[in-house]
Amino acid sequence: MVRLVDIIHMINTSIKSNKIKIENLYKSIFSDGHTTDFIFEESYVAIQHLDSSNSDPALLEINENNDGYRVSYWDGYSLAEVVEEPDISKALKTFKRLAKKLAKNLNRFQLN
């Protein structure tokens, strides 16, 4: 017997199938007028700070690969955090945590 929980788990197994959830996350966290760019592709999502004075601007990205998902956070100076997750739901939780961190840093340093 197939349960609804099993169906939902099977449906939300990729970045592409979580598009609405990811877009809503971006809109809710970065609605304060931050100058950011949102890039969504089938197996890649990025939130990048648009700063012409910085050749290496702050960037948050999630990549889907054969082993799972890689979430990378660049703070504008160096690679600050990399998390590998085998499961999309855990990867999205990490992505959300780091998106909040990115927004907080943009607010703190008034980079919007």
Role assignments for model-derived ranges:
Residues 97-108:
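Short arginine-rich
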Residues 76-90:
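A short, exposed loop/beta-hairpin motif centered on an aromatic-Gly-Thr core
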Residues 7, 25, 91-94, 98:
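Charge-rich, solvent-exposed alpha-helical interaction surfaces
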Residues 1-53, 77, 108-112:
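Negatively charged, low-complexity tracts enriched in Asp/Glu with abundant Ser/Thr
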Residues 53-80:
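Short aromatic-glycine-(Arg/Gly/Cys) micro-motifs in beta-strand/loop hairpins
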